[in-house]
Amino acid sequence: MTAPLPLDTRKLLLLTLAVLVVWFANLDYRKLIKPDEGRYAEISREMVASGDWLTPRLNGIKYLEKPPLHYWAGAAAFTLFGQDEWAARLWSALTGVLGIALAYYAGRSVFGASAGLYAAVVLGSCLLYVVVGHLNTLDMGLTLFLFVSLCAFMLAQRDEGSARENAVWMHTAWAAMAGAVLTKGLVGLVIPGATLVIYTLIQRDWRLWQRLRPITGLLLFLVITAPWFIIVSMRNPEFAWFFFVHEHLLRYTTTIHQRVEPWYYFLPLLIVGWLPWTA
């Protein structure tokens, strides 16, 4: 007779099956929500139709507000699976599932198998995480890359890891930051950087900055991000000012984008979003 699976393995398999069913079985249960879902799906559709995967366009007009990674993923899904709601939301669903898997792996690696399992269960059952994982928006892809960068940074600090393993994890963090930048812009670099500064101030471990592999890490970051930014700027001379100044500097320093919410705007969203664990 086949030996029964260990308890933790059975739990993990059941959790994996439940997540896959919840995430992928009902991606097309409703129409795309205006304006974001429809906008991003249309940009991906126009990439496929025009064959121009360099300059995003919406209704034939250049759409340079955000980098192209999410649009590329949507266009690839449309090419492989057809143009429908399921394919439009596939990238968000995939990145959501990968985030849950990463929560398990990172928790298990640092704190043990039970901690990893609980981390995956909590993350995968949070209301906001489930909802965003079923929306065709940039947020879940950005969340995954930020999560990878921070978890990889954490794993690179383990004393039990070899020098080679720690170097791999640190370069993974740099690559993930590059993915975040290609998803939603410079916020993909600012958030991990700010987190690192705060962590350093708390730990007072200034040698941490020497372990970042800044030369090879930054080189890897630029190898991933620079080609699109350079080429799209050459093809679209207005891109650099519009993207870096209008969409970044002015967005966060002025009210030009009508972002006038108070500083506590996201606190109620977080409380509701982390249900049922905030109940």
What are the residue ranges of the model-derived segments?
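Membrane-integral, polyisoprenol-dependent glycosyltransferases
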Residues: T2-A279
